[in-house]
Swiss-Prot record:
Residues 85-281 are annotated as: Cache-like region. One of its GO terms (biological process) is regulation of G protein-coupled receptor signaling pathway. Residues 52-64 have a biased composition (Low complexity). Changing residue 502 to E: Does not affect G protein alpha subunit activation. It comes from the Eukaryota. Glycans are attached at residues 98, 143, 215, 274, 333. The Cache-like region shares similarity with the Cache domain, a well-known receptor for amino acids. It acts as a ligand-binding module that recognizes and binds glycine and taurine. It is a multi-pass membrane protein. Residues 440-451, 502-525, 598-611, 665-1215 are cytoplasmic. This is Metabotropic glycine receptor.
Amino acid sequence: MGAMAYPLLLCLLLAQLGLGAVGASRDPQGRPDSPRERTPKGKPHAQQPGRASASDSSAPWSRSTDGTILAQKLAEEVPMDVASYLYTGDSHQLKRANCSGRYELAGLPGKWPALASAHPSLHRALDTLTHATNFLNVMLQSNKSREQNLQDDLDWYQALVWSLLEGEPSISRAAITFSTDSLSAPAPQVFLQATREESRILLQDLSSSAPHLANATLETEWFHGLRRKWRPHLHRRGPNQGPRGLGHSWRRKDGLGGDKSHFKWSPPYLECENGSYKPGWLVTLSSAIYGLQPNLVPEFRGVMKVDINLQKVDIDQCSSDGWFSGTHKCHLNNSECMPIKGLGFVLGAYECICKAGFYHPGVLPVNNFRRRGPDQHISGSTKDVSEEAYVCLPCREGCPFCADDSPCFVQEDKYLRLAIISFQALCMLLDFVSMLVVYHFRKAKSIRASGLILLETILFGSLLLYFPVVILYFEPSTFRCILLRWARLLGFATVYGTVTLKLHRVLKVFLSRTAQRIPYMTGGRVMRMLAVILLVVFWFLIGWTSSVCQNLEKQISLIGQGKTSDHLIFNMCLIDRWDYMTAVAEFLFLLWGVYLCYAVRTVPSAFHEPRYMAVAVHNELIISAIFHTIRFVLASRLQSDWMLMLYFAHTHLTVTVTIGLLLIPKFSHSSNNPRDDIATEAYEDELDMGRSGSYLNSSINSAWSEHSLDPEDIRDELKKLYAQLEIYKRKKMITNNPHLQKKRCSKKGLGRSIMRRITEIPETVSRQCSKEDKEGADHGTAKGTALIRKNPPESSGNTGKSKEETLKNRVFSLKKSHSTYDHVRDQTEESSSLPTESQEEETTENSTLESLSGKKLTQKLKEDSEAESTESVPLVCKSASAHNLSSEKKTGHPRTSMLQKSLSVIASAKEKTLGLAGKTQTAGVEERTKSQKPLPKDKETNRNHSNSDNTETKDPAPQNSNPAEEPRKPQKSGIMKQQRVNPTTANSDLNPGTTQMKDNFDIGEVCPWEVYDLTPGPVPSESKVQKHVSIVASEMEKNPTFSLKEKSHHKPKAAEVCQQSNQKRIDKAEVCLWESQGQSILEDEKLLISKTPVLPERAKEENGGQPRAANVCAGQSEELPPKAVASKTENENLNQIGHQEKKTSSSEENVRGSYNSSNNFQQPLTSRAEVCPWEFETPAQPNAGRSVALPASSALSANKIAGPRKEEIWDSFKV
């Protein structure tokens, strides 16, 4: 029966142990532990291993005190081989040590009992022992008979011990001691042991050797410790619980001995076997076995123990519980301890990881300290095995992580940045000073040509473009990154927006191919267009700033970190898609500027500003493209110093160059003269164009300002324009004067044939006459007078030839419209002229006052000036204000090109000259006396004709320039090259001696039909008949003493001339009736001119004046009105002349005797007027719409002098 019960009991026991182990493994999750299990002895031991943190430290540089004690004990008490094995786990070191018994690590710091619940690898062994102990206690307490039959139940106990090793692989040995006696027995009666040897379990019955357990040693402490510790404190409430109650208690593990606090843990130890330590650290876990006395009081019966192998159990020195807990040497303020798993039962299995901002000063490139592994050997003294104290050093400022003492952030070059910001501040200061300088010289022509407001706007925008360098000098922040975009975009829009709009204005004004007038783009209009551009930029910047603020609310920062190739960190403003959009917008805007530069490439300018602006735009386009490419591609790798230098170079290569291109030429040209050809210079600012009432946008202006056109095309266009103007002039003339419609005569063919015969005179005659004029001008005063008296026919013959040559040139000249040319020159320009020119300009003032009193100039003045005015057609027809400004400060030699003037200036000039004429008439003899002295120069009268005055007055005085010198003077080679007039031919009628004689005759008496051409209507008023022409200077102002000397010779001749004119007055009135309309004007003019002194050199041409006048009159046949109207007008003029002649008879009688030699030439002229009266007719034209084109040659003076002389010649005929 017993043999059959043994296997059955063994199966039940194994089943119970297996269920107990499984339940133990599930118990921590299935149900909570009892209060005694959670807090045994009032100390918590159920904590999981964790990291030591800085909060555990009590001092800033604190480290574990237990670690220091452990290190001291290991160095002092533990043998070196044992300590080396404890640190490395190397068994070779341990085998060399000798021993006589086992070695325990007793007295070392750490909470030893707590390891059972703390270390997870020991939980299974503890649970197995607990279930086995509880099972045995239940069996002994439920059946008292088991205690009496120990020998019979040995198989049960051996099966129980074997099941412990079989159920838990970490248990290397299990033993059980049992005694029927209580504490009185010194040694147990039964001692059974099971040992694991490699892959098999060895059962041993050591009952015979049990008495040695009676001695209390380290090996028997597991037995004596529990026996001494036993105290009967467990009592049952009821004696008769029965098997049901015991089973319930067993399931709840609250039976006798079921509490884990009744287990005993031994220190880790090494077994000594055969005089040497056996490798592998062991720990003994023992538990007491209890039985019941007859009074149901628990009684100690034995001990069950297991030896657990710790070689695979890790030591957690970072934990607060367990063996060697808290014995790490990490400084908790700058590092933290991290255990290393899987190394086994060795010390130093942890890492001291440096916290953020600290680094380990070791040679390893990691921020931790790792203890020596188990494969490393330790040699030397005991100090080598002691754990070292490691300190993590702080990183450089601003580094969150570092591996050594090297800086992690880019180190800025302070001296370089200081030099850059200093130079930038200097440039900004110079820019501000430039604004003040430009405002100071705001009245200068170079500044006004560009516009003061526009230049100041460009300089202010440049100041904004200088700010990005200043912003990048400081550490990046959100505000500075936003300000960087604002300064860049606003500055770019201001500077290059203004430059582009200036180019746009040049394109609209100077290259307009339409004849319609468009509003001129003034500086105010350009500023309004710039305001629109800036408004768009403002709207974009406000939207971008709003998006940035919204991103900041979403924790999206505008500041980022870049890393260089050396792994150095630097802060930077992040580049987003908005930056790409702004770069593309700048590029497109500059492309528009490049197009405008190409469009205005042919436009001339006073200071070449469009050319410099084109260079600035192209420079900005190229440099900005390179800058944005580098910025977008290499921004994350360019440190702050490189980025600062990149912005610095971009700023000065674009902004500084732009300022230099716009300002340096203006101030460099201020000391030098601009180009001489001011007519081709195009000014871009207003230049008082609004007040002058003229805008430079007509078809002629646009055609002449574009050099790409063919001159032949321009000539054809001008011819068409002149024809249209002529048709419009005649239409307006007929509308205002209906009676002129009947004056068109069909006999114009006769006049044309006569003109054709006159123009067949060869040109050699005019050249010969010009040479004789030059020779005659070089003689002295007395000799010149003698030659005049001896050879009057020869000089008159030469004069006739030269007059015919002049008419020939005039016929073949281009028929021009009556456009008004500017003839005034600035005072400063006169000062730079030749000495003779300045003297002639002074005399021109006096001559102008005398001629204005007559209210008319001769038709000869218009015809002769037309012949050469074609050479002075400017390439750009500018307004009067523009001409005045362009020649205001010019000091170079005068140009021969004439400048057109608007009607508003002509009207103002008429009013001024009429007022001067009135003063001249009332002044009388006193005014003529003052005319011999230098008069103050009029800025509006002598501005543009100093050169012409010099040419025309060369005949009266020897010191003046000769006719041969005139071709060497610079002349404007205009587009009308075929109509150029020979200067010698044009001046051939002004030989020495002839000019003085012409001044003493009234042109109304010699050629009254020429005077009628200047008369607009039947009753011309002073406001209509006054022409806006400049008059040549007289010889009186140059040689006053000489002219007074010749007065006595002039007066008798003038008197004879007046006598002859009285005889022919009635006949002339019958033939030329139309001259009576303007007779009042001729009388006043004759009164002043007849009293003008005559120079001796001019006496040579007395006899030649009448035929030449006749020839000139023959050339006017194309514009003669019908004969009937001419006769009526002539009678009226003759009546008025007769009335006026009574008042001036005294002066005429003095002059009459000196011109007797010219009476032979009077009769042919009178006969011609009687036979061909239609040739002396001319249509009346309103002077308000006409003006005389005055070239810069000698034709101006010739026409001016010829008028009064012809009038006195006619008086001499009548006398």
